[in-house]
């Protein structure tokens, strides 16, 4: 079970809304989101309703300003509680449809290019656990939530290009 409280203003001020499960449309409850407090679980915030648009990964902790979660604006229109898994395994492929060179990860990787000579990933398989893929190294840039399953091309995980700089396991430390 997870719990997140979203606040309209910075510093946990203004109108707020508490969630303990997935919420596809926050618009009736909040006009904007400038701060958040994650009491338990790991969450993905989405810029648009129905889990679309830019994504922002939050772990347990206080985020007094939307820039602390790398938010580009105060628009948060949906949120998802990410299921926890004990083990993690992901395979990344150089080309679409699981072709070309492959590398498998079971741990976080802050710089993909240090481990895999490519900085573009065109397909992947999430075999165990949930992962967050980042467009840039050191867990920066656009973020993409990956749940167990097959992703035959980068558009399948919502990306507009194949650039991948880092990846992180979703682990709830609570």
Swiss-Prot record:
Keywords linked to the UniProt accession: Cataract, Disease variant, Eye lens protein, Repeat, Sensory transduction, Vision
GO molecular function, one term: structural constituent of eye lens
UniProt-listed GO biological process terms: cellular response to reactive oxygen species; lens development in camera-type eye; lens fiber cell differentiation; visual perception
Impact upon substituting residue 24 to S: In CTRCT4; reduces solubility
InterPro entries (UniProt xref): Beta/Gamma-Crystallin, Beta/gamma_crystallin, G_crystallin-like
Family matches, as SMART domains: XTALbg
Superkingdom of the source species: Eukaryota
Family: Belongs to the beta/gamma-crystallin family.
Record note on quaternary structure: Monomer.
Protein's name according to its UniProt entry: Gamma-crystallin D
Organism taxonomic ancestry: Eukaryota, Metazoa, Chordata, Craniata, Vertebrata
Gene giving rise to this polypeptide: CRYGD
